[in-house]
């Protein structure tokens, strides 16, 4: 990830939200306003721009992707506290080891549930 050693972040978009099998059409890299290796903050300007772009294609933002540079791919207390939408998918890429590890979660009212993540291409 280009942002390393800082946390990288971005939004994902697709045609549906809230179904059992949401499909991600696009990854939208964002600036990490926190400039940190431990936390991320998506630039509100990036978020608004991406929301408008995907709505023009009848898609919507369906989640966020970010890296954990020094920890496992599991939501931190900060991640849980920042989770803005219970319908979103939260994809975390751990860079703790030589080979990155990616996992996906839903975060609803502070409860964390892992989801199956299938990468097609």
Model-predicted segments: where are they?
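Short, well-ordered beta-to-alpha junction loops that form the rim of enzyme active sites
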Residues: 67
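Conserved beta-strand-loop surface patch within small alpha/beta domains used
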Residues: 1-61, 70-121
């Amino acid at each position: 990830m280009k942002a390393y050693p800082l946390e990288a972040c971005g939004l994902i978009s697709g045609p549906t939200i809230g179904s059992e099998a949401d499909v991600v059409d696009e990854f939208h890299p964002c600036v990490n306003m926190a400039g940190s290796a431990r936390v991320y903050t998506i630039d509100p300007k990036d978020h608004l721009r991406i929301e408008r772009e995907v709505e023009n294609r009848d898609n919507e933002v369906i989640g966020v992707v970010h890296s954990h540079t020094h920890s496992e791919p599991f939501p931190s207390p900060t991640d849980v506290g920042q989770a803005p939408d219970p319908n979103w998918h939260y994809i975390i890429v751990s860079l703790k080891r030589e080979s990155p590890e990616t996992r996906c979660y839903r975060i609803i009212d502070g409860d964390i549930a892992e989801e199956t993540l299938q990468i097609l291409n």
